[in-house]
Amino acid sequence: MAQDPNHLIWLDMEMTGLEPDRDRIIEIALVITDSQLNTIAEAPVIAVHQPESVLDAMDDWNKNTHGKSGLIDRVRASTVSEAEAEARMLAFLQEWVPARTSPMCGNSICQDRRFLARYMPAFEAWFHYRNLDVSTLKELAKRWRPEVYKGVDKKGKHEALADIHESIGELRHYRDNFLRLA
């Protein structure tokens, strides 16, 4: 359990929508990997309580997706506030990664960063300002090497921890089949 500045922090969140001005965070997961993408630690996944009015305001896609996964029920049952979720995630990160050393890692993580900046600014500030966004490689492979892009098997569960593991696997795929490391 030693801090290592070379560890990578992988983040995924589920939200009630895509607009931080009106939508809220409902689930957070973190995974720490080494620089070779081997899992070092996983934080407990947190369902963040939100009032019924926030859940009712979700569009049909979010209600359907988060309803099927059971997330809406877990959010209703949760007693963890956004502030408490932020404190728990920061406590976890303090064990593994020094502040402002790891980029935020994941898929389309600019979206996650927008929500963190709005609702959990201390948590967002723990990350380096850089991003390691797997979706950049996805977009490049789609255009430059479609056969590599098509080789990615994603389930798209929209469950935070499962999505992180898919993102790590996707980056491994691009590392092995798209990037020339030798």
From Swiss-Prot:
One of its GO terms (cellular component) is cytoplasm. One of its GO terms (biological process) is DNA metabolic process. InterPro entries: Exonuclease_RNaseT/DNA_pol3 (IPR013520), Oligoribonuclease (IPR022894), RNaseH-like_sf (IPR012337), RNaseH_sf (IPR036397). It is found in: Cytoplasm. It comes from the Bacteria. Residues 8-171 form the Exonuclease domain. Pfam families: RNase_T (PF00929). Its EC number is 3.1.15.-. GO terms for molecular function: 3'-5'-RNA exonuclease activity; nucleic acid binding. It is an enzyme of class 3 (hydrolase). Keywords: Cytoplasm, Exonuclease, Hydrolase, Nuclease. The active site is at 129. HAMAP family: Oligoribonuclease (MF_00045). Belongs to the oligoribonuclease family. 3'-to-5' exoribonuclease specific for small oligoribonucleotides. This is Oligoribonuclease. It comes from Azoarcus sp. (strain BH72).
